[in-house]
Design a protein with these regions (language model features):
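Structural signature of outer-membrane beta-barrel channels/translocons
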Residues: 18-22, 54-58, 136-138, 142-144, ...
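Glycine/serine-rich loop-strand microenvironments at binding/catalytic pocket rims
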Residues: 23-26, 135-153, 167-169
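Surface-exposed loop/interface segments of Gram-negative outer-membrane beta-barrel transport/assembly proteins
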Residues: 1, 38-42, 48-130, 148-248
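Residues embedded in well-ordered regular secondary structure
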Residues: 1-40, 78-81, 115-123, 135-140
Length: 248
């Protein structure tokens, strides 16, 4: 197990700027983090940026609120299977031969865990965007009109490549590449009026409005084999023998 694990080291950096005036305030912040997983070849780099803006005018009768955040993450997912095969692997067997080739016992469901991590790639990118804008207008002392719009967006793009020399999924396919992508978006729009009135012993609050929301999702998965070389990994899908022979 020691050959496929490590002491994970992580670091985080933050910076923020804020300011404004009596009618306007703002805050902008950024965050960077690098995280190493305890499994070799696992971890991620992430950058996150946020912006908040508020403004009021017309003697505070009209107020604007704007919030936005953007996150970009690059991940190395590694292979959890390496931990399982590290437990099953013969502890007295070598990891490699003298010529550098990986030792592999010809047994059912038994793979060299170090070879799994060294010969193959499993990584991905994720982007998230969140946006919200809100406007409040005090039409009367006890009547407020509000409009609110928000949107969330997420994109994932993952890639796997199993070497032509990897007994773990790659050898019997002449190299195996997998790509997966997905897009999700969510939109929300609301507009409403709020009436508030206080009486001697009670309060009356009435809200009337309209709300619309939309959720969309689409994804795509591709798996191809029979590659002439491992040099370009999953970036060389056009060279796949499966594709050239009409199998995909």
């Amino acid at each position: 197990v020691d050959e496929v694990t490590r002491t994970g080291v992580s670091h985080v950096h933050n910076v923020a700027i804020s300011g404004g005036s009596e009618a306007t305030t703002f805050r902008v912040s950024a965050n960077f983090r690098n995280v190493e997983g305890i499994l070799q070849n696992s971890g991620f780099d992430q950058i996150n940026a946020r912006a908040n803006f508020t403004h009021s005018t017309l003697n505070d009768k009209l107020k604007f609120d704007l919030n936005m955040s953007l996150t970009n993450r690059n991940s190395d997912f590694s292979f959890q299977e390496a931990l399982r095969y590290a437990v099953l692997f013969n502890p007295t067997a070598p990891i490699t031969f003298d010529n550098g080739d990986y030792y592999q016992a010809i047994l059912f469901d038994n793979f060299n865990p170090v070879a799994i991590l060294d010969q193959n790639v499993n990584e991905g990118k994720r982007k998230n965007l969140n946006f919200n804008a809100k406007v409040d207008y005090a039409l009367l002392d006890n009547l407020t009109l509000t409009a609110n719009y928000g949107q969330q967006y997420e994109n994932n793009l993952n890639g796997e490549y199993y070497s032509r020399n990897s007994l773990f999924r790659g050898l019997n396919r002449g190299g195996l590449a997998r790509r997966y992508t997905s897009d999700r978006s969510f939109s929300l729009f609301e507009t409403y009026a709020t009436f508030s009135q206080s009486f001697s012993k009670s309060n009356l609050d009435v809200s009337v409005g309209y709300s619309f929301q939309e959720d969309q999702f689409e994804d795509f998965f591709l798996s191809l084999g029979n590659f002439p070389s491992d040099a370009l990994g999953y970036y060389a899908l056009e060279t796949s023998g499966d594709r050239l022979s009409g199998l995909a």
